[in-house]
């Protein structure tokens, strides 16, 4: 049996190739949308990708089942409870896909979603009766389990799904041998759970000992535990869960229609008409010079989460980036189902050299120079509530970034406004958002709360108190 793990850091997403080394038949489990990596690897090993399995309809990314189906003519498989617009083969509890000396078997494990399955992989030569590995999707993570609260929109409550999850774990997964390898669909940083480990693989035995959600408890206690303290899900999650069930264009089609080079005048005209302009460069570069009223979401950070949270999927998007990274931006937006890119600024910021009237800058301030500001200062901590509770600048107010757009009115228009996050990535997003809304007294705290703690600063300026 051949198993290859593929990991996308930006989405904390793991997908897998499972192949039989005798027959050279391969299956891809929970593929990402840019599928060349699987096709190229299969070719290099002499494998043929005949099967594509989705453990469930993912909410945090668009899966690559359509792309693989069209590129390599593979069959698509879903759990028996799934309904979709495209053709697929239904996997009942116990359904088998034979690869050769390797057997894949579906096990229904609803809870994170109603249609969720776990895929068991058997090496028929070594042990045909017990699985060598299981691919748990979002049912069981390393150190956590899948959140049950993402499907209220389809009439299934978090309470009901949490109950299903308890039964799936207790009556299905935990009945398997301790030595079974566990390969989940997500790792640390994913918002599909609340405490995922950064491990890549574990055994069921280790999870039985150390995973808080697998400890002995009643069903009611489990439901209370799992439904509490889940992080707020990005706005695009519901949209992606639905789009994964639909017929849709392939990523190649999306990229082809999005790669349009536009001159400065066209970009500015479209911006004035209401088109969204995102600048994906690093915070320092954006601060130094950018197109007025553009939103900074750095491509080298948690781009998908914040783009999916702050951008409107129904309003056209224009991109400002280094030209050699534009296609990457389009692909990464496509991974979360944003098909509304209408083009990019030709030559990036070079195009604005002769248009200085369209250039703006964002003020940055260091932790050691805040006390030099004279007058009223409001420090806005845009980290999550939990981060703020774990430690914050005395006198600061907590407005998490994902709610900032709806709470700008709480921030005084007079005096100085300093925004910060933990390390500086999110705060430049916040600063650009505030400036886009007409605020011109905004400073970004370079290095964020980490820099503040490192320099052991105290707040001596007059810090404005506003309602949190």
What is the predicted function of each stretch?
Residues 36, 57-62, 83-86, 114-115, ...:
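Active-site environment of divalent metal-dependent phosphoester hydrolases
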Residues 1-48, 119-137, 143:
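Conserved beta-strand hairpin/beta-sheet module of binuclear metal-dependent hydrolase folds
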Residues 31-32, 57, 81, 113, ...:
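Active-site metal-binding loops of divalent metal-dependent hydrolases
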Residues 147-149, 155, 206-242, 246-248, ...:
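Rhodanese-like catalytic fold shared by cysteine-dependent sulfurtransferases
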Residues 24, 103, 113-232:
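Metallo-beta-lactamase
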Residues 28-29, 49-58, 77-81, 108-111, ...:
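Active-site neighborhood of phospho(di)ester-bond hydrolases with catalytic His/Asp-centered motifs
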Residues 33-77:
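Active-site metal-binding motif and surrounding structural segment of the metallo-beta-lactamase
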Residues 18, 30, 56, 68, ...:
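Divalent metal-coordination and catalytic microenvironments
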